[in-house]
Amino acid sequence: VNKNLKIFDEIERLLKIKLGNKVEVVEENDSKYLQIEGSEFWMSNDFNELVVGFGINHTHFSEDYDNLNLGIIRTFDLLTNEIIITEYKKGETIFKVTTEIKFPSAKTENIGTVSFLVFPFWKKTKRITSHYQKLIEKSDIETEVIILLNSDL
């Protein structure tokens, strides 16, 4: 079993302990997909990559990229902080989506912007901002995350 899958399985185990039945996992064709009911958070393990996302924005982590620990940190940052998603619309067409993590210090980190090339550029731009509350208190899972980061999975 590759390291990406071991990390996915360990995160799944921790989330099921903390969030119970809200954690939904689907396995299909050597891939696993996890989402949390009522949330935009998701992650998957396929093609030897751990993919962590919130809404449409996502990041790929892998042993090959030497960034698996960053994947663990990103996962728990998304779960333990407020998330801000800003959609930019022209008419009824969304042409850009930005996702940010808002940390307790009020600092924000842009974790991704997705833009679409075809949109009615002549129409007025509307900006819609949505706030998603943290799913887990950091203090409730911090010890387990530190252990996971320091493990030899």
Locations of the language-model features?
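Short linear motifs in intrinsically disordered
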Residues: 22-25, 37-45, 83-93
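Intrinsically disordered, low-complexity regulatory segments enriched in Ser/Thr/Pro
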Residues: 38-70, 109-153
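Generic recognition of long tandem-repeat/solenoid scaffolds
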Residues: 30-36, 50-55, 95-102
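Alpha-helix boundary/N-cap detector
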Residues: 2-6, 10, 63-66, 70-73
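Amphipathic protein-protein interaction modules
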Residues: 69-121
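Surface-exposed polar/charged interaction patches
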Residues: 14-21, 25, 78-81, 138, ...
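N-terminal "first-domain core" detector
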Residues: 1-37
